Amino acid sequence: MYRKISFGDFQTGTIGISVKKALIEGPIRFLQKEKQKMGKRLSYESIEASPEIQNWLTQFAASDALAAKSLLSRLEFISRDEYSEWLLKELASLSNQDKSAIYSVRKFDKDDGNGCLWQKDGKIQLRPAQTQGSEDFVSSIISNANRLYNKCFLDHPSLMELRDYRIRNIILVDDSIGSGKRVSDFIAMMTKSKTFMSWWSFGFIKLYILCYARTVQSETYIRKHIAGSDHGQRINRVSSKIQFISHIVYDSYNVHGRWGENLQSILSLCMSYKKNK
């Protein structure tokens, strides 16, 4: 019944995949047509005045229309341009240090490369032929940054390139992080390589995780599941080898703060349509 939105806009008030599935292209087209700015929320007046949104609302039962409007009014839409400008700015600040490697975080199938990011010959696992949505968009920004900043980044390098260039800083880029599992799984695929794991264990590698929006809880999850120890007596503690850089950081448990007084009706709406999808 529902169509997923493209990367063009995402929201920081997520309460689960059911909300994301409730978003389709009508509100997105409206925002793009009106050239809304970063973090723009839809007013009830704009919701009522938009033919695109009114058409979007027809998929809901009349009794659910108010909850659907409440959901829309609490979303914050971020444009592609806004995200791109933020990411390029952050990459510029990191371009002043030694040459770094950049990888766009993506989800792999469990059987890809026996769980390792790199193949046996040291080359990175091939990207799938089908589109990866936001990951493809992030990859295009990375390529642009490399041209702008005098090729100070290695774009998805092999293990041999990491070794030959003596790379010490690795940047992992994502659009937004919820639970942290996708990033954690990606790092686990990196440390699956004995060579990379050796560099990581001896403190030769530092990870920078760049994402526009993330939950407070995701940082805890990623640190907990990454290889190594954060014990105070360890020389190369995990916490000293990983840094998070985000524009928006929010508490995933503060659902009332994000969804307002109509939280319960929004939750009921999402759960109802999740069951019926």
Feature locations, PLM:
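PRPP-associated nucleotide enzymes
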Residues: 2-277
